[in-house]
């Protein structure tokens, strides 16, 4: 065939394409890169490529696209999991002269525009997320056009296709059905840097038994790894601000939660360091600005969740520090592998905290919905004649909306429900059986991965060898540069004054209580019935005040004087539009003395009168047992009233409404509404701690 000769007789064409892609006139192929390209272009194989981070997997499919398009194949379809990865790949592809279009939540290109360009053969590379395959409009409009003249299909981070993998995504399983519809002889490429043999065999099964696996050594030369156990968050914050300035170049600090990203970033900025935040809740513009600043070296520290994860291409990252432990060795290898792709030396430091286990076990427990939860969703769908939204289902079942979406997504992938438009769902005729054993097996594997991560932290052997063995690569005996190989532990030197400042910082991370604008039925709450913006002192269970709140509520039956003083300090720093003239509180059936005692002591310190004026009209269930907003709102609707014996001041002024815990804000909303209707002009909600996720 002509294309065979094209590749074998003109190897300089491949090399020239690579040099154009990288922008380096002396660039050459890494070992096995040329073979991978020939596998796709010459033999038109299905190839699974397992190579270390920074090896150049994207170069393989960009060069292959360049050649295959020259031979008359259709546009390459690149399925990529993260926006940061998409942006990196699009920039690189355009350097090679590939005409690229991306369809995602941030792109301006519409589906109809993409369809027009495919029909006109004006696009070489189509970049989509796996979730886009679930969009009915995309499936009905774009996929038939791609199927009419298919080209190379690339599944980036192919380990996501396997539910044994650490980052399984249900939408990736749609890809298997897509590939089964393709004719023989069509090249398909799956790429990953983080997959052991079990995950690869599962991925190979879904890509086809004929798929070829090319696996390289996963050792990251020059990356010096180390572990430091600092259970206390204040110690870790002080360590970051003291030691990161001594690290060469720019780098990443990974956190497990968005809240920790915000807290760590603020601490570093307050300490005078050049740091920015990065997580999924930020705008696309803010994330792109942060990516670019890290890429051009103008940013020292990017504090990030896994939203900055797979495939982020920055060869000059000098260090990666984990503020908390990831859930698996595989995930850690992937994240720490961001460091030092093009550097002689780089660092990876794992800081282990006391909260790590609780956070990671929560992730494991939330990963798969229970059988009862799924059947409740199916019961709602079975009872409806018309397609329904997530919010409509949430009004009928006591489940978090995010969990309902997760359930629907899994059922949609399984063909048990069908997405109608972009927002509604309906039941299909397909039967469904809960995969009890499979779910249990995966939960067991996740727990064993967590145990393996603990073993990594405790290991006295080579750190890099531990990681690569976990990925079934036994090629490395010892790296010679990690803390264990060199016998030089990660410095735990801390300034006691800085630790004290970090403790105070954590205790002053007041949170905002946003007023609700709608009631439990979705109707607008009139302005004259709404609470004002409020505050909470801390997060439930956090180091410092959070732990004191937990102890006071669950063990002591009384909140410590330190908490009362901290609340008073919070109020003193509050920039009220109208100063409060009194304090009142939320009554409780289960702890009738706990909050009144807190309110009385706070009012005394503030020098304000205590208004003992609210009462419960009925017993309500604990709000923590209500899983979504609709149920939480209905649970407390009409549950508060003014005591008939209440004595109010002649002239009503702004008042503080105090509770110990805030979660959904519905309790404060309903009680505050009663106070507003009685004539209080402003109600400031105040709580000791928030338990909101």
Which positions does each model-derived feature cover?
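C-terminal accessory region of SF2 helicases/translocases
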Residues: 299, 321, 325-334, 340-536, ...
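Conserved beta-strand elements of the Class I
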Residues: 75-77, 101, 252, 276, ...
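Arginine/glycine-rich "motif VI" loop of SF2 helicases in the C-terminal RecA-like domain
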Residues: 338-345, 369, 576, 605-606, ...
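DG-centered beta-turn motif at the end of beta-strands
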Residues: 658-661, 665
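Helicase motor core with emphasis on the C-terminal RecA-like subdomain
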Residues: 2-11, 16-21, 31, 35-58, ...
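Active-site signature of alpha/beta-hydrolase-fold catalytic machinery across serine-
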Residues: 62-63, 67, 202, 597, ...
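Active-site-facing substrate-recognition patch
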Residues: 223, 498-582, 591-592, 596, ...
């Amino acid at each position: 065939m002509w294309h065979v000769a094209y590749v074998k007789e003109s190897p300089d064409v491949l090399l020239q394409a690579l040099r154009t892609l990288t922008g380096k006139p002396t660039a050459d192929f890494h070992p096995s890169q040329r073979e991978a390209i020939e596998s796709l272009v010459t033999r038109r194989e299905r190839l699974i490529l397992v190579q270390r981070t920074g090896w150049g997997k994207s170069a393989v499919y960009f060069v292959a696209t360049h050649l295959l398009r020259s031979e008359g194949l259709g546009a390459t379809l690149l399925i990529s999991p993260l926006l940061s990865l998409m942006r990196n790949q699009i920039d690189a592809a355009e350097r090679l002269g590939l005409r690229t279009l991306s369809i995602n939540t941030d792109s301006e290109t519409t589906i109809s525009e993409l369809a027009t360009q495919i029909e006109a053969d004006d696009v070489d590379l189509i970049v989509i997320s796996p979730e886009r395959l679930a969009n009915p409009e995309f499936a009905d409009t774009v996929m038939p056009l791609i199927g009419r003249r298919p080209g190379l299909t690339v599944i980036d981070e192919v380990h996501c296709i396997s539910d044994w993998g650490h980052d399984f995504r249900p939408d990736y399983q749609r890809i298997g059905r897509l590939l089964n519809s393709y004719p023989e002889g069509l090249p398909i490429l799956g790429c990953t840097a983080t997959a052991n043999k079990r995950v690869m065999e599962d991925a190979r099964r879904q890509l086809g038994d004929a798929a070829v696996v090319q696996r390289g050594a996963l050792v990251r030369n020059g990356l010096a790894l180390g572990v430091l156990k600092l259970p206390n968050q204040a110690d870790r914050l002080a360590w970051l601000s003291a030691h990161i300035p001594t690290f060469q170049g720019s780098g990443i600090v990974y956190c497990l939660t968005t809240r920790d990203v915000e807290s760590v970033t603020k601490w570093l900025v307050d300490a005078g360091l050049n740091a920015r935040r990065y997580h999924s809740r930020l705008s696309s513009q803010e994330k792109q600005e942060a990516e670019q600043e890290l890429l051009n070296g103008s940013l020292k520290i990017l504090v990030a969740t896994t939203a900055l994860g797979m495939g982020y291409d920055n060869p000059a990252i000098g260090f990666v520090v984990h503020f908390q432990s990831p859930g698996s060795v595989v995930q850690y290898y992937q994240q720490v592998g961001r460091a030092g792709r093009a550097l002689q030396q780089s660092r990876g430091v794992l800081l282990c905290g006391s909260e790590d286990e609780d956070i990671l076990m929560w992730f494991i427990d939330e990963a798969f919905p229970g059988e009862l939860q799924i059947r409740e969703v199916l019961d709602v769908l079975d009872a409806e004649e018309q397609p329904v939204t997530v919010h409509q289902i949430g009004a009928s079942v006591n489940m978090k909306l995010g969990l309902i979406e997760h359930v629907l997504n899994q059922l949609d992938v399984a063909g048990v429900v069908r997405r109608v438009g972009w927002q509604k769902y309906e039941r299909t005729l397909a039967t469904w059986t809960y995969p009890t054993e499979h779910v249990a097996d995966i939960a067991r594997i996740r727990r064993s991965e967590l145990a393996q991560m603990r073993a990594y932290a405790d290991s006295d052997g080579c750190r890099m060898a531990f990681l690569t063995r976990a990925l079934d690569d036994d090629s490395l005996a010892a790296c010679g540069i990690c803390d264990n190989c060199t016998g030089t532990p990660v410095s735990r030197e801390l300034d006691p004054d800085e630790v004290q400042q970090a403790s105070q910082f954590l205790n002053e991370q007041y949170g905002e209580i946003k007023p609700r604008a709608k009631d439990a039925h979705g109707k607008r709450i009139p302005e004259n019935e709404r609470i004002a913006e409020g505050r909470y002192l801390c997060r439930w269970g956090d180091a410092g005040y959070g732990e004191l709140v937990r102890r006071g509520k669950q063990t002591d039956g009384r909140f410590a004087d330190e908490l009362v003083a901290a609340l008073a300090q919070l109020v003193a720093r509050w920039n009220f539009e109208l100063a409060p003239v009194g304090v009142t509180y939320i009554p409780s059936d289960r702890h009738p003395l706990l909050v009144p005692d807190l309110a009385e002591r706070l009012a005394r310190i503030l020098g304000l009168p205590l208004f003992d004026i609210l009462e419960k009209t009925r017993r309500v269930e604990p709000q923590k047992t209500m899983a979504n907003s609709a149920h939480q709102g209905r649970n407390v609707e009409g549950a508060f009233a003014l005591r008939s014996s209440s004595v109010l001041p002649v002239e009503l002024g702004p008042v503080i409404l105090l509770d110990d815990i805030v979660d959904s804000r519905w309790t404060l909303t309903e009680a505050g509404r009663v106070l507003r209707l009685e004539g209080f002009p402003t109600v400031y909600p105040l709580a000791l701690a928030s338990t909101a996720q």
